[in-house]
Amino acid sequence: MKIIKHSFDGVIVGAGGAGLRAAIEAAPHMKLAVITKLYPTRSHTGAAQGGMSAALANVEEDNWNWHAFDTVKGSDYLADQPAVDILCKEAIDAVIELEHWGLPFSRLDNGKIAQRRFGGHTVHEGTSPAFRACYAADRTGHMILQTLYQKCVSMGVTFFDEFQVLDIKIEDGVCQGVIAYELATGDIHIFETRAVTFATGGFGKIFKVSSNAHSLTGDGPGILYQKGIPLEAVSYTHLTLPTNREV
């Protein structure tokens, strides 16, 4: 076993949809590494089939305010409402951005991105169902991963695939790096950095019943919790898809 040191301006832990998108945003501004215990296109984002919701209004009248209303209502009014507003406003540009990067969305006869109804989405604040979910056949999440990963590769992002993060290094209250285990060799890698982003996904597989991938074991939140870093809303986790009333 060897101990290998690396130096990067920033490190992202996790290479699902969130981690890859964060890498695209950060890569032009810093020397960046993405550490992932899976090959990026195997991440659980690929399990999402139904679509990505955005008020494009390609099929019928729609706007982001109605999307925000549905999102807050769907959270039993517990969601951070300013964050919901940002999500629903920026979802429109995010879908168009993915289209420009090459995501093969399904299309309407007029060539626009196809949209379909999906649970809980309405127009006029609950009056009738909305055509809001933008989709790529039945493999939307898979195509999102492929598109984001291709974009990262084209930008020269450095990936460390099949590396299990073990710990973070904190000195004087400041994160100084990440310690990871290379699965193929058993070598320990120390990543010295001044910025770390955790995008390790959910933790449904700590429960007996879950449709989450077997890789979703809560490694990231567990590491942070052990270091005394506060976690937010850990009681809200997605156990199954489709969503069920009883498990």
What are these regions (language model features)?
Residues 10-33:
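N-terminal Rossmann-like FAD-binding beta1-loop-alpha1 element of flavoenzymes
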Residues 28-47:
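Glycine-rich FAD pyrophosphate-binding loop
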Residues 54-86:
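Glycine-rich active-site loop/strand segments that organize a redox cofactor
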Residues 12, 16-17, 39, 139, ...:
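Residue-level detector of alpha-helix initiation sites
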Residues 237-243:
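Conserved small/polar residues in nucleotide/adenosyl-binding loops
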Residues 99-187, 192, 199:
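Conserved redox-cofactor binding core of oxidoreductases
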Residues 83-89, 133-147, 211-215:
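Short beta-strand to alpha-helix junction loop
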Residues 1-10:
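Extreme N-terminal leader/targeting segments of oxidoreductases
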